[in-house]
């Protein structure tokens, strides 16, 4: 029960993590109730409900000029959708193909394959909802798809980021363990990988539960738009959210990042201390490329968003206003690039993935690949037999 409570606590963190920006609106009257957005500050309008065509319309929120400028500016209506379009166009087919390879083309389910399959699944579950997010930003941050789809979009959006961090950490530790202990029992390792993967999915589900429970869409009459996860009433901000987000940044980002970096440093030391034949040198170079790719993902995708998240809520806590939210939006947008980088990680980690990806791009069926492998093996055996026969003949003639 204690662990469940902690998971719910972390969930409360995630739920206040995103938001948008850009447009203008009216100044707030002093008699109105304060309401604070997850990132933008607004106020609940208390006048009687407006009616349109005889149908009551629920009171909306008014926001300050800074928040309005973000919600209507080019940052959220041009830059963000362009990046999301790029991520969708690259991430959907690449992760779809990766998941297909891991599930249907890879026979041996090693721990690395299990972690990479889960990572590809997390990316795919996030990317498939991007058309809704792209449409939302292109239409001036106006959400027209209902409350339920907004909750699903936000839940999968944040769940993907933390899933990627945790599965990338597992993959890094597993790669180091393979180098240090190459003779370990593969079936036992695979069972452990399955258990760890299930635990990660359960943790992410618990963490994102509040995103599905709380109201995510807010109507802003001054702009005539309905925002999705961009404005939230102040009364829902229960407790010190800065501490929650700080805990999430330390527990789900900083600690896994340090663990990943440590695993790669030890991996390089181990490879350097081993005998450097041609095969070991290729393995070391591939490991270095993998390290560079993963570190680039952390520094570009995860570090800025988690750092600015903490700074943003610290400013809201201490100054009741945050002017770094536009930067946080950019960082959060860049965090989605991990869905494009992950397939390159699979390429560097797994030779089987490289072979299967090449065969898939060349439209070779499994049967065709098997025939080619049998033919190649037969040719190698024939050459070895011919070499043995010629050496035997030369021995006989010498006598």
Swiss-Prot record:
Q: Which GO terms describe its molecular function?
A: G protein-coupled receptor activity; G-protein alpha-subunit binding; G-protein beta-subunit binding; heterotrimeric G-protein binding; protease binding; proteinase-activated receptor activity; thrombin-activated receptor activity
Q: Which residues cross the membrane?
A: 74-103, 111-139, 152-179, 186-213, 238-271, 280-319, 326-349
Keywords from the UniProt entry: Cell membrane, Disulfide bond, G-protein coupled receptor, Glycoprotein, Immunity, Inflammatory response, Innate immunity, Lipoprotein, Membrane, Palmitate, Phosphoprotein, Receptor, Signal, Transducer, Transmembrane, Transmembrane helix, Ubl conjugation
Gene3D superfamilies named in the record: Rhodopsin 7-helix transmembrane proteins
Do you know which SUPFAM superfamilies this protein is assigned to?
A: Family A G protein-coupled receptor-like
Processing and modification events after translation: A proteolytic cleavage generates a new N-terminus that functions as a tethered ligand. Activating serine proteases include trypsin, mast cell tryptase, coagulation factors VII and Xa, myeloblastin/PRTN3 and membrane-type serine protease 1/ST14. Proposed subsequent cleavage by serine proteases is leading to receptor deactivation and include neutrophil elastase and cathepsin G. At least in part, implicated proteases are also shown to activate the receptor; the glycosylation status of the receptor is thought to contribute to the difference.
Give residue ranges on the Extracellular side: 39-73, 140-151, 214-237, 320-325
Name where it mostly resides: membrane
Glycosylated residues, per the record, are 33, 224
Q: Which cysteines are joined by disulfide bonds?
A: 150-228
Which ranges of residues are annotated as propeptide in this record? 26-38
Which superkingdom heads the taxonomic lineage of this protein's source?
Eukaryota
Ranges per topology, Cytoplasmic: 104-110, 180-185, 272-279, 350-399
Keyword Transport assigned to the entry: answer is no
InterPro entries, per database record: GPCR_Rhodpsn, GPCR_Rhodpsn_7TM, Pro_rcpt_2, Protea_act_rcpt
Q: Which Pfam families match?
A: 7tm_1
According to the record's subunit comment, the protein's assembly and interactions are: Interacts with TLR4, COPS5 and TMED2. Interacts with GNAQ, GNA11, GNA12, GNA13 and GNA14.
The record describes the protein's role as: Receptor for trypsin and trypsin-like enzymes coupled to G proteins. Its function is mediated through the activation of several signaling pathways including phospholipase C (PLC), intracellular calcium, mitogen-activated protein kinase (MAPK), I-kappaB kinase/NF-kappaB and Rho. Can also be transactivated by cleaved F2r/Par1. Involved in modulation of inflammatory responses and regulation of innate and adaptive immunity, and acts as a sensor for proteolytic enzymes generated during infection. Generally is promoting inflammation.
Similarity section: Belongs to the G-protein coupled receptor 1 family.
Q: What else is known?
A: Synthetic PAR agonist peptides (APs) that mimic the first six amino acids of the newly formed N-terminus activate the native, uncleaved receptor nonenzymatically by binding directly to the corresponding second extracellular loop to mediate signaling.
Supply the name of the protein. Answer: Proteinase-activated receptor 2
Which organism does this record belong to? Answer: Mus musculus (Mouse)
**Name of the gene encoding the protein in the UniProt record:** F2rl1
């Amino acid at each position: 029960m204690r662990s469940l409570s902690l998971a719910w606590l972390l969930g409360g963190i995630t739920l206040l993590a995103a938001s948008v920006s850009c447009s203008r609106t009216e100044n707030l009257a002093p008699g109105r109730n304060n309401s604070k957005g997850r990132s933008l500050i607004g106020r609940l309008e208390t006048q009687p409900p407006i009616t349109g065509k005889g149908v009551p319309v629920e009171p909306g929120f008014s926001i300050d000029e800074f928040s309005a400028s973000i919600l209507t500016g080019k940052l959220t209506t041009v830059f963000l959708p362009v990046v999301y379009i790029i991520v969708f166009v690259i991430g959907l087919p690449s992760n779809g193909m990766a998941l297909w390879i891991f599930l249907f083309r890879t026979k041996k389910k090693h721990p690395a394959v299990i972690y990479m399959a889960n990572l590809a699944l997390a990316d795919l579950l996030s990317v498939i909802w991007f058309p809704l997010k792209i449409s939302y930003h292109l239409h001036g941050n106006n959400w027209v798809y209902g409350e339920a789809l907004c909750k699903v979009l936000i839940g999968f959006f944040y769940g993907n980021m933390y899933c990627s961090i945790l599965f990338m950490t597992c993959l890094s530790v597993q790669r180091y363990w393979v180098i240090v202990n190459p003779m370990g029992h593969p079936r036992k390792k695979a069972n452990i990988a399955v258990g760890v993967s299930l635990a990660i999915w359960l943790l992410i589900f618990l963490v994102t539960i509040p995103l599905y429970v709380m109201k995510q869409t807010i109507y802003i009459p001054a702009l005539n738009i309905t925002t999705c996860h961009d404005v939230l009433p102040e009364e829902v901000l229960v407790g010190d959210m800065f501490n929650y987000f700080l805990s999430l940044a330390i527990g789900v980002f900083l600690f896994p990042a340090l663990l990943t970096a440590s695993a790669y440093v030890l991996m390089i030391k181990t490879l350097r201390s081993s005998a450097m034949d041609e095969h070991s040198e290729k393995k070391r170079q591939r490991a270095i490329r993998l390290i560079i790719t993963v570190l680039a993902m952390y520094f570009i995708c995860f570090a800025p968003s988690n750092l600015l998240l903490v700074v943003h809520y610290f400013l809201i806590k201490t100054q009741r206003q945050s002017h770094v939210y536009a930067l946080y939006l950019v960082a959060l947008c860049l965090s989605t690039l991990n869905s494009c980088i992950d397939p390159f990680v699979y390429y560097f980690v797994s030779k089987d993935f490289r072979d299967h990806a090449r065969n898939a791009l060349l439209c070779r069926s499994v049967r065709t690949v098997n025939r080619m492998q049998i033919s190649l093996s037969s040719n190698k055996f024939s050459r070895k037999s011919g070499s043995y026969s010629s050496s035997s003949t030369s021995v006989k003639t010498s006598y």
